[in-house]
């Protein structure tokens, strides 16, 4: 199965990239502070825990995000969204991944989930994407579909902050 959009991998170097004809998404959420919070957040993002804790179905060909891993996200038990991991990053202060849409996904585009620890020790989650409607129901949803994408991105931050709360108190 091939990707349903171009340019594949565009988010790797620039999380704010948005090619012509796509809608941008960029949500940054403060998760906490310190190395323990960063390590916990990175693991939760790389091992699908954040997504599973949100109540979405994750069917992946590997237990951890890695390039070329296929992932199908199921929303509300009904909407299946097949994707493939394009890139991952695991550095001392930055960890995460991005996937691109495959045939059958209601949208086409790319989405990244990146945890970073800034110089002052603050840990952030950035959810960044560029997308446009692919299916008839995503097109019919128009602005409401984009609103749901933003709500999902904000919820990622809330859920990850909750998952990291124990690490913040250690």
Where are these regions (language model features)?
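Beta-strand/loop substructures that line and gate deep hydrophobic ligand-binding cavities in soluble
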Residues: 102-147
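Hydrophobic side chains in beta-strands
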Residues: 29-31, 73-75, 87, 117, ...
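Hydrophobic-ligand binding "helix-grip"
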Residues: 76-120
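Hydrophobic ligand-binding cavity/cleft-lining segments
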Residues: 1-76
